[in-house]
Amino acid sequence: MNNVLLHRITEKGNIRYYSIEIIATLFEEYMVERVYGNVRFKSCTGIKNNVFPSFNEAQIFFEKLKKQKMKKGYA
């Protein structure tokens, strides 16, 4: 489906990542999954999921998140 991997380097030199993906579920819904963290750690800092009844709604949310993260310095 749709996915994007964003990253940024903080002032302290930490590399942060933020992955956003749209996934079709078995129930004809769409889930936007966000995985984020610091590359220095073995596992991610967090995972968040949002479920939408249509692809269009999921796409709008996906683009909104992407725009917000890019404003915060992720590329």
Each language-model region and where it sits:
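Helix-centric, low-specificity signal for extended rod-like, repetitive segments
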Residues: 1, 9, 27, 59-62
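Negatively charged, low-complexity tracts enriched in Asp/Glu with abundant Ser/Thr
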Residues: 1-13, 43, 53
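N-terminal first-folded block
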Residues: 7, 19-20
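Short acidic/glycine-enriched loop/turn segments that link adjacent beta-strands
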Residues: 13-14, 28
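Short aromatic-glycine-(Arg/Gly/Cys) micro-motifs in beta-strand/loop hairpins
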Residues: 20-48, 63
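A short, charged, amphipathic alpha-helix used as a generic interaction element across diverse proteins
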Residues: 41-44, 53-70
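Boundary/linker segments flanking structured domains
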Residues: 72-75
